Amino acid sequence: MPQPSVSGMDPPFGDAFRSHTFSEQTLMSTDLLANSSDPDFMYELDREMNYQQNPRDNFLSLEDCKDIENLESFTDVLDNEGALTSNWEQWDTYCEDLTKYTKLTSCDIWGTKEVDYLGLDDFSSPYQDEEVISKTPTLAQLNSEDSQSVSDSLYYPDSLFSVKQNPLPSSFPGKKITSRAAAPVCSSKTLQAEVPLSDCVQKASKPTSSTQIMVKTNMYHNEKVNFHVECKDYVKKAKVKINPVQQSRPLLSQIHTDAAKENTCYCGAVAKRQEKKGMEPLQGHATPALPFKETQELLLSPLPQEGPGSLAAGESSSLSASTSVSDSSQKKEEHNYSLFVSDNLGEQPTKCSPEEDEEDEEDVDDEDHDEGFGSEHELSENEEEEEEEEDYEDDKDDDISDTFSEPGYENDSVEDLKEVTSISSRKRGKRRYFWEYSEQLTPSQQERMLRPSEWNRDTLPSNMYQKNGLHHGKYAVKKSRRTDVEDLTPNPKKLLQIGNELRKLNKVISDLTPVSELPLTARPRSRKEKNKLASRACRLKKKAQYEANKVKLWGLNTEYDNLLFVINSIKQEIVNRVQNPRDERGPNMGQKLEILIKDTLGLPVAGQTSEFVNQVLEKTAEGNPTGGLVGLRIPTSKV
């Protein structure tokens, strides 16, 4: 998080930031960033701190004597409190001279780009060496040090509580010490609000300054804060340890939870990695592992336990939510922009391997078989070129192979067709013919088939789409011009011609020289010509699918009429049998039904429409213009 510029602040508030003289990591000017090639120049190593500061020495100077009234609630704290030098050394890192971070060439450094905030330019970024990246601090670490107290006071003033705290809780067992329930600024999670109790929480009647927040933040009686200065990592890292203090107070668990949340900053995609604390719970139980320990407190409630041990288990689970940023010997660093993550290198492949296996299986299943052409030979030759063709990339790979498919039959013999079909069916379980255009519909977009238990008069398929369907149903009042699109009369001869043209186009495309073998100057023109041929094949395939649908519709309507004839005939036989029960010389009803089905119904169409279209094409190739379609009359102009 970028630091605010003190140049635009009020003088008293700006002086509070300028009063401290600790020299921490200093970001240099943009001129030095642009001219230096060494990425280590960004940070100056700290000189050894030669003195320690006590909060009593400079407490009034921070306040600048503006809010003296607000100090009354902290008199007891200051009288009973020891020299918390380590806490105040950490606060000095918050309140250090911010002009060192803003010592850049111009005043408009706070632009819209993140490189402006960091003082980096687009050409010479120090974040290019992986070794240096592993040593540089993460944004989450910098944010947790720079933005906790100040940002909480700016964004959450209503949630701050002024509490009289006593470092000796045993002497006052009747009072509960409550921490402030302030949410981190960057957190997107909703914190659990503490239960307001009249005897333990007092609302601040006046605005609370950042210094008061600082005092309350650093005065938890059950915290031990240790800071380790490591110059080799160029940053000062804070390690927070929260030691459990067993009390019979249910509010204590929320105190520890909020104390841990104050030391953690969620920063969107760049979050500080958590480390498990080596604390043995008093009476703990296993909880599901979540990315952050805070989410365990927010999302997971402790398992119920019998007896008085449930309270201790709740305390121990809440205390385990403490976080720390340890040194490099305990965990590996993550880059600021998550370019290099060394922790999950061994975990990610194991997590992704089942997904990759599933994707491989789906790819195998999704590769639809094309009868004859669009073969693996052609795809392996032109794989590199087709990946580079952006114009035809809209049609997916299986569409490209479908575009160049050819019918599984040959005009010479039907036996060749059966042989090719049997071989191809062994290769792939799912087949597609040249007239089956892939629309890439998801199962949710496709119409769901009705189960027999769901059939009724309203959901059964209607008969408005019969051969004369334009004169029935909702299309009765339609008086638009009859075009080729609205003409549902099948033309098997046209479908056969489209298949022959697709076969020729496939041969032309497969004979083209691969783009990778052409010189660079000739590649664009070759791609353009190949895209033209592929687009023509795609259009032909759509026409072929439309013609095949006409053939399917005709066959289904014919089968529908035949089934109605069989049903009406057997119904009449049943009526005759009931009216003349003595006439038993003929065959029984089952035999009559079988005879009707055998004489009336031919090969099944419903559920086997692809096979039906192929049979029609075989008969058309043998010289039958109607393809064996019953009742079809094709005018000579359409042949």
From Swiss-Prot:
Biased segments, Basic and acidic residues type: 371-380
Residue ranges with Polar residues bias: 339-351
GO MF assignments: DNA-binding transcription activator activity, RNA polymerase II-specific; DNA-binding transcription factor activity, RNA polymerase II-specific; RNA polymerase II transcription regulatory region sequence-specific DNA binding
Residue numbers spanned by region Leucine-zipper: 533-540
Organism field: Homo sapiens (Human)
SUPFAM superfamilies linked to this entry: Leucine zipper domain
Protein function: Acts as a negative regulator of the endoplasmic reticulum stress response or unfolded protein response (UPR). Represses the transcriptional activity of CREB3 during the UPR. Recruits CREB3 into nuclear foci.
Top-level division of the source organism's lineage: Eukaryota
Entry protein name: CREB3 regulatory factor
Composition-biased stretches (Acidic residues): 355-370, 381-401
